């Protein structure tokens, strides 16, 4: 299973990083960030942006994936930033998983330096260490995957909130949704891709949205490959969408950009 391989590699990488910067030291750095935010009365913009009227769009910085291989050969993050700014993306999702998605922390650090747009750190979080790391890197939100964390979801959710990070909790079926609701998770990402076999169906959002309380923020993830798909998923009543591959493949397509902007204007 691809997911198992990703998690195994992640465990090795996290242990290696703990030797470079000890956990207590990193936690201290993260708390220092939080204290500065409190002093500056900084409000995390993540939820506010996702709760705004109309459909919120999270655009992903995505070089590769296990199912599609390399998506963007010439991966220039400043070029992608300009493109996303031009088409009006609300939140940036930055992949930092190195082995299977070819992401890296530096992408997030660099974007944070030059943009005020809220950032979701997209990775496979299995250790509190990565929560502290996300804070130090400058993320506003982090991905927590219900199928990866299981019952540990509650403690990871709480720890993220302690560091003023908004967790986007990813689910794929009713059992995972029940887990997210048990821990009163506010932002629920419905992944239309099964992480075990990587099959995709937009019907997953259609089915699960009926079971999600109206006060939650619902984000549809994966499988949105056209403007038509966007219109379909919007009709299901989601609050937002997370799109990676479609945007990455259309970076130089002016016809797509015009169509997308038209879609946004009709939201």
Region roles according to the model:
Residues 57-61, 92-94, 119-122, 142-144, ...:
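Hydrophobic faces of well-ordered beta-strands that scaffold small-molecule active sites
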Residues 68-168, 174-179, 205-208:
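N-terminal active-site wall of soluble small-molecule enzyme domains
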Residues 126-138, 172-184, 220-243, 258:
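Catalytic cores of alpha/beta
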Residues 6, 59, 84, 92, ...:
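Conserved, mostly hydrophobic/aromatic
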